[in-house]
A protein has these predicted regions:
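Pyridoxal 5′-phosphate
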Residues: 1-388
């Protein structure tokens, strides 16, 4: 049976060029980048070159890039180290109700330590109201962390306007750009972003590597203690093959390639919607009504059929999709994103699926998915009708 992967918001297959780069580095540049001998210098050159590529991708300075194990670590670092450094200036932190759990769980911890965390609501498009942010900002606000693109429904926050508002206050602005990086053009200077988190495995790079951009005016205390790597900001011997692979994945994403991907994903999304409508499937797009979305994610409420049934039957039919964030899907928890948008009693919470396109997705894949989903929905609704 052929298996079709439509869960690219969870992770992506590693690009062949990235694999080639990494295997070459594993064989040739195995030295410790902190060593002063030839092998160390060789590894350090790869590290510097890769860091420059990553920095250029968001219009940042090379020294502003802290290499991490991925966006989870980057988010924790930005939030917890800001709280540690600025606790004497204020205890208010602002975020949203639909952030990734690597933001929400540090927030819960900080609340237990006496911090005042404000969770901004979102509208039915999964976007905050700027007026709510403006009202929540106080002189005691030390950090605002709002994701750039949502991993479950694909909503895209008004980052430029948020940056402007935050910088009228005393707060720092952090954004989790994990889902947007690689699809959208990001400029940390233009958007007045102080800190930004990224993971390589969302852009056809390796897992367990990412970065945290930190504006050079901000000096966070070290997150991991030990050696003096990353200019004393994050201890631990750098993973040179992974860093080089990350940089290669970024190099592949030229502006023209990103534009082509956006156009392809928009076409796939339209194909799904038109096909399911033609097949008589009763569904709605979660977050519908917004023209500003991270284009590879499509979250749908399939009326009358549970998420579990849809996901299980699609898996049996050979399709990899998701009921929400891969980081919580194994727990079968209801989507906190859909609850924030529609309320915990909405049938959408228990009857929605997420599909997410990637560079290897084809029109034939989408056609096959629509046929399989149609068959599954019709079969289950007929079974329900027979029991009535």
């Amino acid at each position: 049976m052929e298996h079709i992967y439509l869960d690219n918001a969870a992770t992506t297959p590693i690009a062949p060029e990235v694999i080639e780069t990494m295997t070459t580095q594993m064989a040739q540049d195995f030295g410790n980048a902190s060593s002063t001998h030839f092998f160390g210098r060789q590894a350090h050159t790869v590290l510097d070159t890769s860091r420059h590529i990553l920095a250029q991708s968001i219009n940042a300075k090379d020294n502003d890039i802290i290499l991490t194990s991925g966006a989870t670590e980057s988010n924790n670092m930005a939030i917890l180290q800001t709280a540690q450094k600025r606790a004497n200036e204020g205890k208010r932190i602002i975020t949203t109700a639909i952030e990734h759990h690597s933001v929400l769980k540090p927030m819960a911890y900080l609340e237990s330590q006496g911090f005042d965390v404000v969770y901004l609501p979102v509208n039915a498009q999964g976007v905050i109201e700027l007026a709510d942010l403006k009202a929540a900002l106080t002189p005691e606000t030390i950090l605002v962390t709002i994701m750039m693109g949502n991993n479950e429904i694909g909503s895209h926050m008004p980052i430029h306007e948020i940056g402007q508002l935050v910088h009228e206050s005393n707060a720092w602005f952090h954004t989790d750009a994990t889902q947007a990086y690689g699809l959208l053009d990001i400029d940390v200077q233009e958007d007045q972003i102080d800190m930004l988190s990224v993971s390589a495995h969302k852009i056809n790079g390796p897992k367990q590597i990412g970065f945290l951009y930190v504006n050079d005016a901000i000096h966070l205390p070290s997150f991991l203690m030990g050696g003096e790597q990353e200019k004393k900001r994050r201890a631990g011997t750098e993973n040179i093959p992974a860093v080089a692979g990350f940089a290669k994945a970024v190099e592949l994403l030229t502006p023209a390639v990103k534009a082509e991907h956006r156009a392809r994903y928009a076409g796939f999304k339209q194909q799904v919607l038109e096909t399911l409508q033609a097949n008589g499937i009763n569904f709605e797009v979660n977050g519908a009504g917004s023209d500003d979305m991270v284009g590879h994610v499509l979250n749908m409420w399939v009326k009358g059929v549970s998420t579990y049934v849809l996901q299980m039957n699609l898996d049996l039919a050979g399709f990899a999709i998701s009921g929400g964030s891969a980081c919580t899907a194994g727990d079968l928890e209801p989507s906190h994103v859909l609850i924030a948008m529609y309320g915990e009693n909405s049938p959408r919470v228990a009857e929605s699926i997420r599909i997410s396109f990637g560079v290897e997705t084809t029109e034939a894949d989408v056609t096959a998915f629509c046929a399989a989903l149609t068959k599954i929905v019709q079969k289950n609704l007929a079974k329900q009708a027979g029991k009535a």
